Amino acid sequence: VERDIKQTQKNRYALSFAAEAAEEYGLTQEVFNPCGKINAAASESGEKHNLEYMGHLKAMGEDSTWLDEEDMKRITGSNYYLSGLLTPKTITIQSAAYIRKFAEGLSRNIDIHENSPVVSLERTGGVWKAITPKGSVTAPKVILSVNGHLQSFGFLKNRLMHIFLYASMTRELSESEVRKLGGEPSWGAAPANPFGSSVRKICGIGGHRI
């Protein structure tokens, strides 16, 4: 429990940083929404996961709210889910729009080089040299945000397992389809069972979509 409390404190620091950036760069609620997160259960095993998770959160001193089948139907418009667990201190981020707006804000003080893939890293004379197909950049420190490609730069050899995830999105729903679907205009559900699927309904510039 103590380890998870410390990790949650780190997570809260990151969320606070993201919230400050959202305010500074004028991000809309469609991009940055402190609406909490629902762990949705569609099976008995999922409900078991949620009950155990709720107990663990209580031991950590964290708030959570149990959502029954009627609550889930009111939110999603569907009777697919048996129940859900809402953790209110989490945030939903439209990551592509967030990164774009974040980059626009940072570009006031830094240079951003897009479409310039780093193909290799060299360390000489106490500095790093990031080499691209058409040039290079040197810096005393480098942050590698490359996920599984960490191995491509010589780190964590034989330590990572690559997992491919896929996503799909509906076309813009018609007004009649939105009425038939029901539920709240925007919501998100993460799977209580680790092998389940995340589902989001959005309502914004691109219309209503799932």
Name each model feature, range by range:
Residues Y13-L27, A59-D63, G77, S107-D111, ...:
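Generic secondary-structure signature for well-ordered alpha-helical cores
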Residues T65-D68, I112-E114, T132, L144, ...:
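General beta-strand structural signal in soluble alpha/beta enzymes
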Residues V1-E69:
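Dinucleotide-binding Rossmann-like beta1-alpha1 core, especially the glycine-rich loop
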Residues E30, D71-N79:
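Flexible hinge/switch segments at interdomain interfaces of large molecular machines
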Residues C35-K37, L82-G84, L165:
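Short, solvent-exposed beta-strand edge segments and adjacent coil->beta transition regions
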Residues S16, E24-F32, V118-W128, S136-I210:
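Active-site substrate-recognition segment that forms the wall
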Residues V1-E2, L82, I210:
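A short small-residue
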Residues K48, G55-H56, M60, N79-K141:
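Helical element adjacent to the flavin cofactor pocket in flavoenzyme catalytic cores
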